[in-house]
């Protein structure tokens, strides 16, 4: 389960980077050349999703919980926003949901 969780975090990081770089270009006037690493990050994101040993719908559902946690870490580290108690509670609920889904992968 730890390997799966780490793979989800890597997947989420690729998705966030792949979306953040075009955001920098569109909102902050950064170089258009950021679209190239953004495209690479998004392609890596898609490839990483294929490495999970479950049906795609289950993978996407479980991945959503980890994405929430990763996005909140990004909010704290990159955007410099202090997380609220609601952020932490939401992350905990999302992560618990992911763990429940992943725990059932081999049982169905």
Curated annotation (Swiss-Prot):
Main location: membrane
Subcellular location field: Cell inner membrane
Membrane association type: Multi-pass membrane protein
Pfam family of the protein (one): UPF0060
SUPFAM superfamilies the UniProt entry points to: Multidrug resistance efflux transporter EmrE (SSF103481)
Source organism superkingdom: Bacteria
Entry keyword DNA repair: no
Gene Ontology CC annotations of this record: plasma membrane
Keywords noted in UniProt: Cell inner membrane, Cell membrane, Membrane, Transmembrane, Transmembrane helix
TM segment ranges: 6-26, 29-49, 61-81, 85-105
Family membership noted in the UniProt record: Belongs to the UPF0060 family.
Name of the protein described by the UniProt record: UPF0060 membrane protein Ent638_1931
The organism's taxonomic lineage, starting at the top: Bacteria, Pseudomonadati, Pseudomonadota, Gammaproteobacteria, Enterobacterales
